[in-house]
C-alpha cells in the first residue's frame, strides 16, 4: 500500500469540504476517492428519530461514485461554508491502522472560536491509498 501519513490525509480530506471552487472540489474528490468509492453517513440522532418516525427502516445516507460524492460535498459546502460563517478543520490525532484511517474534524467560526460541530471519520483505503469507503459520524 502507498505510504500515506494519516494527518496529511485528514488535512486534505477536510480541506475538500471547505473548498469554494467547484472544479477544485471535483478534482480533489477524484484524487482522494477510488472510482466507485462510497461516503456513508450516520445522521445525527434527531434526524434518525424523525426518519424512524416516518417509517424508514434505515436512516443511513449514502453517496456512491464521483458524481454522487460531488453532489454530497457541494451540498455540505453550500449549507455550512458558503454563507461565510463556518469552515471545517481536521483535529490533531489522525491515526492509521493498515488500510484504515480514523480522524476527527470540527466546524468552527471563520473568525475563530469554539467548535460548533464536528465528528468522527473512518476512511477505508485501497492499495493506492485512495478512499473506498468513508464512514462519517457527525456530532460532538
Predicted segment positions?
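C-terminal and inter-domain tail/linker signature
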Residues: 1-140
Amino acid at each position: 500500500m502507498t505510504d500515506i501519513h494519516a494527518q496529511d490525509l485528514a488535512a486534505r480530506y477536510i480541506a475538500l469540504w471547505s473548498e469554494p471552487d467547484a472544479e477544485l472540489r471535483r478534482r480533489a474528490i477524484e484524487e482522494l476517492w477510488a472510482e466507485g468509492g462510497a461516503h456513508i453517513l450516520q445522521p445525527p440522532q434527531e434526524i434518525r428519530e424523525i426518519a424512524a418516525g416516518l417509517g424508514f427502516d434505515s436512516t443511513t445516507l449514502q453517496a456512491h461514485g464521483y458524481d454522487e460524492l460531488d453532489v454530497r460535498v457541494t451540498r455540505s459546502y453550500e449549507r455550512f461554508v458558503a454563507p461565510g460563517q463556518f469552515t471545517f478543520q481536521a483535529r490533531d490525532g489522525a491515526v492509521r491502522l493498515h488500510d484504515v484511517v480514523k480522524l476527527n474534524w470540527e466546524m468552527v467560526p471563520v473568525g475563530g472560536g469554539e467548535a460548533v460541530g464536528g465528528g468522527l471519520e473512518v476512511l477505508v483505503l485501497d492499495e493506492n491509498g485512495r478512499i473506498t469507503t468513508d464512514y462519517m459520524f457527525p456530532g460532538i
